[in-house]
Amino acid sequence: MSRPVPAVFGSVFHAQMPVIAYKDGKWQPTEWQTSADLTLAPGAHALHYGSECFEGLKAFRQADGKIVLFRPTANIARMQQSADILHLPRPETEAYLNALIELVKRAADEIPDAPAALYLRPTLIGTDPVIGK
């Protein structure tokens, strides 16, 4: 079955997104939310200090139909390094990887045939509503 490739890169988003909140000094369980606009407090750290980092990786459909992620552990390590540099909470490897894998499973029918791919953009943002924190 041939799967179409979206006409404009970055213009189509999956219906759901994983959200892993950091509260009371620890990461919370992954929640799946409808992909929608985000709401941030006017004092959100990301808005005043740019405390945000992101990564990018791809999921490819192989000739046999199997879907593979390209170097997810390297992606996670880069995100953790960026979090350390920005003094943001360091994402937990297992939860991050499980969220990526689950997202790819949920989006499997949307992954185009090679050489195209599903592009994932994990993002970490400082949402504390205190400018001086």
Give residue spans per PLM region:
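Conserved alpha/beta cores of soluble small-molecule-handling proteins
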Residues: 1-133
